[in-house]
A protein has these predicted regions:
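Helix-to-loop junction immediately C-terminal to a conserved catalytic motif
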Residues: 49
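The feature captures the beta-strand-to-loop junction immediately N-terminal to the Walker
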Residues: 34-36
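Conserved ABC ATPase signature
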Residues: 133-137, 141
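Conserved ABC ATPase "signature" region
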Residues: 112-129, 154
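ABC ATPase nucleotide-binding domains
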Residues: 222, 226, 232-265
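Conserved ABC transporter NBD signature motif
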Residues: 57-65
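Catalytic Walker B motif of ABC-type/P-loop ATPase nucleotide-binding domains
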Residues: 158-162
Length: 265
């Protein structure tokens, strides 16, 4: 059971940002998408969340075409967290997380909805924040609340676009730990966009590298080579091991004219 993208082209107006993507994202794994700015990572996630319609190609979840599913069905299956926005409605933490249960409401929230929200508040260590307004929270606290809202949907797929952007190292680690543990515990299909290679190596099971709208490399984190990183990001360096953790150490910058890039997958 998986999320499968086949021959996908997507973009805005007449511009194609994602070009010919073929990929399978499996359950129970943290799948991390990496690539330079403007490589199509966010557009890919938006298309998989059905925020953006594909120009060509298909997206199938558990062998069902997303195009044939209603928005309510999508909301029960897929939770999508876009890049951080400065405009957050003035609601309490509890109300914000409860919004994740809205696809399941009949005549407002029931006992089951409240139980799920309270459980997630405990899990993400947000106890004591329930009655605070979200616009009064720190960046790390707000990201936890927005992640909690996604988890409240009890989705099968979690799509997170740069969920640790602008956060300090402690909050980055806390949020990534929650994502990884929840993915394994609930057997989620998790996709997240990251820019930090070393955090991707630490938390990713499978990595997907994009450049210029195309998928250039995919594989397990343990299979990644420095040549792939150099090809995608145009920086030279080495993969080293420290305390059982693989790290990429940059040695120099490579201009595009100095490298020859292979074709996309």
């Amino acid at each position: 059971l998986s999320l499968e993208v086949k021959g996908l082209y997507a973009g805005y107006n007449g511009s194609l940002v994602v070009q010919g993507i073929d990929a399978i994202f499996s359950k129970g794994r943290v799948n991390i998408i990496l690539g330079p700015n403007g490589s199509g990572k966010s557009t890919l996630l938006k298309t998989m969340a059905k925020v953006l319609q594909p120009k060509v190609g298909t997206i199938r979840l558990f062998n069902k075409d997303l195009q044939n599913l209603s928005l309510k069905e999508i909301a029960k299956l897929i939770a999508y967290l876009p890049q951080r926005s400065n405009s957050v409605p003035r609601m309490t933490v509890f109300e914000t997380i409860l919004l994740g249960r809205k696809p399941y409401f009949t005549f407002g929230p029931g006992n089951r909805d409240l139980e799920i929200v309270n459980s997630i508040i405990e899990e993400l260590k947000l106890k004591g924040f329930e009655n605070k307004f979200v616009d009064e929270l720190s960046g790390g606290e707000l990201q936890k609340v927005l992640l909690a809202r996604c988890l409240a949907q009890t989705p099968k797929v979690l799509l997170l676009d740069e969920p640790i952007n602008h956060l300090d190292p402690k909050n980055q680690i806390e949020i990534l730990e929650v994502i990884k543990k929840t993915t394994y515990r609930v057997n989620l299909i998790t996709l997240l966009v990251l820019h930090d290679l070393n955090l991707a190596l630490r938390y990713g099971d499978e990595l997907f590298f994009m450049k210029d709208g195309k998928l250039l490399w995919k594989g397990f984190a343990s299979e990644l080579t420095s040549e792939v990183i150099e090809m995608v990001f145009e920086v030279e360096g080495e993969l080293a091991e420290f305390s059982n953790q693989r790290l990429f150490i940059i040695s120099s910058y490579t201009t595009p004219s100095e490298k020859r890039f292979p074709k996309a997958l």
